[in-house]
């Protein structure tokens, strides 16, 4: 018994050290990205400061004064909060007032969208894997793309919920409105994704047809409730902290890194679509028509599809 307890404690220590190591590596990489040559400030034409500390010491010129927006006029440091990547301790111990002030001044862009998509895709995949392990005892691959640990449905959901929550927050929408809109958006996302996969690729990753409360094959009332609850929590708790921690790009390294990630995601999604199209064509006996399709058949065969997308059913016919 003592040996078992000691082994568990040792395992927990190893896990803690690994997690801490990854966290430190991530922090180091994030700090490295924020260093280097700074991006030019779009409004004032001056270099954006790297930290909030240096941002507050930047002298104000007549040019910057004329470019001041209403948000920054009401709060002179709002602009600094937008362009600055805050120091790690300040982000961790941020207050609600700081986050709200930052959200009032920031502008959503491609930088935030890409980070949210990647984080949502990976976090959603991890949570689904854990959920399947706890509820069904299954340890199957639930990825949605041929390269990398990504589930694009969760990534798209994170982006949509953030964009919608951001606008609802600006309009001071009540909780019931946030809940209903989030439920509708989540249901539409599931319906469009499921219908598109079945219609164009004859593939199916999930079905609610066996549930008594299903609305369509891909939408059920219980999951609309979960989408609404998730959207409400996202709007009130997750979104403000996520956008505050992501910040806005201040260095060329950050801009280049996000551009490379974007190109990788485009290639990953494009290759996944190509693999699904060839899998559908192979099922009906259509041979490859060009060198690229031959290469896809050679490297992404039906065996690869089955092993990679273990929850995916192929050759499914749409119900009439």
Regions found by a protein language model. Give the residues of each.
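Low-complexity tandem-repeat tracts in intrinsically disordered regions
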Residues: 52-70
């Amino acid at each position: 018994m003592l040996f078992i307890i000691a082994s568990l404690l040792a395992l927990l220590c190893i896990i803690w050290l690994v997690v801490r190591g990854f966290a430190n590596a991530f922090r180091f990489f994030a700090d490295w990205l924020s260093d280097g040559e700074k991006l030019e400030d779009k409004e004032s034409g001056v270099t954006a400061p790297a930290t909030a500390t240096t941002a507050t010491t930047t002298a104000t010129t007549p040019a910057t004064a004329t470019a001041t927006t209403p948000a920054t006029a009401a709060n002179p440091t709002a602009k600094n909060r937008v362009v600055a990547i805050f120091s790690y301790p300040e982000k961790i111990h941020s207050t609600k007032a700081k986050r709200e002030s930052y959200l009032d001044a920031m502008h959503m862009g491609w930088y935030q969208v890409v980070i949210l998509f990647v984080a949502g895709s990976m976090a959603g995949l991890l949570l689904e894997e854990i959920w399947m392990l706890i509820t069904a005892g299954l340890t199957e691959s639930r990825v949605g793309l041929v390269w990398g640990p990504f589930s694009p449905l969760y990534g798209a959901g994170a982006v949509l919920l953030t964009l919608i929550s951001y606008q609802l927050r600006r309009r001071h929408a009540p909780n019931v409105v946030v809940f209903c809109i989030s439920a509708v958006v989540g249901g539409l996302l599931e319906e469009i994704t499921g219908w598109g996969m079945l219609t164009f690729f004859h593939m199916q990753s999930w079905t609610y047809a066996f549930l008594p409360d299903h609305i369509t094959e891909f939408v059920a009332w219980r999951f609309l409730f979960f989408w609404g609850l998730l959207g409400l929590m996202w709007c009130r708790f997750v979104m403000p902290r996520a956008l505050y921690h992501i910040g806005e790009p201040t260095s060329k390294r950050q801009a280049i890194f996000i551009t490379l990630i974007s190109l990788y995601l485009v290639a990953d999604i494009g290759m996944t679509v190509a693999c699904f199209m060839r899998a559908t064509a192979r099922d009906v006996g259509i041979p490859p028509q060009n060198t690229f399709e031959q290469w896809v058949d050679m490297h992404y065969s039906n065996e690869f599809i089955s092993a990679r997308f273990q929850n995916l059913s192929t050759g499914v016919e749409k119900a009439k």
